[in-house]
Amino acid sequence: PMPLSDQKLSTIDPNGNLVDAEARLCRLRKSDMTEAYAEFIYHEPEKLIWSNPIPSHNNRIMALRDVIITSKNPDEATARYSWFANKGSIKKIDELGWKIQLDRGNLAICKSEALSSLIRSKILTETDGIAGYTVLSNDIPTTAKFFSDNNLDFIQINEDLLALPFPKSIGGCVFIGKDESVFPWSG
């Protein structure tokens, strides 16, 4: 990758005021980042723009937490994402891969062949790229009922964890947990 460039971008808050957002950018050739263009780093003015609580939804999902990324070389990808996010603290996830803790949530980076054991399920297939996302629900039974009522084909992994596969054309999955402890890399 090219050197990082710190920039300020402007956005408008709900009151119509111009707010500066600090951004860290770099140019990448597609060959430099084959697994994904992950844009889940950090958005500083989030607190300003969402000064009121995010409205609740009927599905009871309340927060995006993690992005699950697969790579042929998780060690190299972890080093790159750690550098890009300016986060030096990484943690080994057993033999599955690595976790980079962000200001909100994590990047979980693993080998594609480790995906089936990542959530102890056979839901995810071998791939390179963004394999899934994790979100939190404040009421798993209500979330499951919402999915069922809307004819969404979800999987109940256990009483605290659901999975909602994306269409095959997109691939991947959203994992919905009651809290962060249900995801294997949170420990």
What are these regions (language model features)?
Residues P1-G187:
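Glyoxalase I/VOC metalloenzyme domain signal
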